[in-house]
């Protein structure tokens, strides 16, 4: 049976990628259908109850700057907020929020249900409708056909999902949910490169059975940060304490005793796990000389006693899990409410995608989230937003848009995946970005919101708030540039008390703010500066003053590299014609098909010398072609 309404975009999956994809498409005015196997699990946090962290909060802010939901939902559901790397430079500072699972999920669902142009429908998808090599719809498990101009697939861990606890395993997309096996089989018939990855989760613990008095308390920051540019501290629910405890030598002995029944060490699991979030058995095996590993004990919510012991993800047999947990300080009488487990699932080589996240082999089909080999809610949400907006633009007959590496961490994420691929779950870090001083958490709106408005992603409320901030920055910068402090005045004496060497000639306030001893607050106090602006404007003034030289230098580097970054490589380019390229380089370039010289240069094994040869070849043939046309 065919559904009566045709949609512009269909999104399969209601996780973090799927919800951002559906919302982005609908915000752009395109009729959008979100299909999920269970409406009650929309926006569910399947693993840890937290959003943000190093590199990840940068993605959340970028999603937010483009009108996405993750940041706002975090402010409404966050029960502890902390700024990580607060004493380091602004490029690596990151906000992390502990979230109440139910409050977060409710915020996402409310956003979905109130979004114009968006329809929700509860049905699992078993098949794709393909006509003339193009994806034009989907078929649900009850045979209902939905047709569309574009389809975004965000299946998470559900494609061929297998859950492992010890040597026992069963099919599942996550605990309590069936996998999408029919769809997984259908996708394996298509010309995509498919492999397996693994992720895991720790056992959950009943807080009533835990002795918190022997653990280290970890409270959130005060004053409280916010995650969204539109966020307000008043939106935050009650704030709670997290705790820290540690494994010990006894814990590690218990874990080692279960290695012979571990699916990881007996070859039962083939998939590769996340390097930066290893299981506790992997850590014990990899670091045999380490007697202790830190565990963050995180509340799951305000209305539950369940705890998430971050740091002991495991797929060991349940009896080993229970013994290991009870050997940990504070957990001696712990009751496990849900066992930890590992899950194996299908993912598809992201090198088979375009930068728009549309698949190369099937027009109209987009992939986003863990299906592309990433791990993390934030990475999924960022891909979902990009896939959703480009699916909508395809429906509108418009060209795709993807941010460059120097514009956004979203650009870094997508370019890394497509240029280099991944053989393990990919996680974002600030170290992955060459231009991280320009791609800060605090300026994602200044980088992206204007473009988001142009794309149709940003609504009036966000646009007004952005303009107020931008205008405030311009006004304050002008004021600081034109307010002078002259030697031997009361203002100069007040400033001299804060700095090592006294002022010998006049300075404007912006130049004074470049000095490491001075902050906006103590400088404004010293010169009795009235009518101080919003804290976000003050933050920008300090960063732009103190890091001006570094920021200008990075901007110059970007400008120099822009030529290579934008030099297009023809789709059917014959790399065999370029003399001097090694067979390895020819093979990699022919396989990956980079779109630009800049992208080609980031492929492992493609040397700067090879890029120079390509550049010379392109210039030579461009001139030959031009001469032939003139003749």
Curated annotation (Swiss-Prot):
SMART domains, sorted: GIDA_assoc_3 (SM01228)
A GO biological process held by the record: tRNA wobble uridine modification
Primary location recorded for the protein, binned into one broad class: cytoplasm
Keyword Cell cycle carried by entry: no
Job of this protein: NAD-binding protein involved in the addition of a carboxymethylaminomethyl (cmnm) group at the wobble position (U34) of certain tRNAs, forming tRNA-cmnm(5)s(2)U34.
HAMAP family: MnmG_GidA
Name the record gives this protein: tRNA uridine 5-carboxymethylaminomethyl modification enzyme MnmG
Organism field: Alcanivorax borkumensis (strain ATCC 700651 / DSM 11573 / NCIMB 13689 / SK2)
Taxon lineage: Bacteria, Pseudomonadati, Pseudomonadota, Gammaproteobacteria, Oceanospirillales
GN (gene name): mnmG
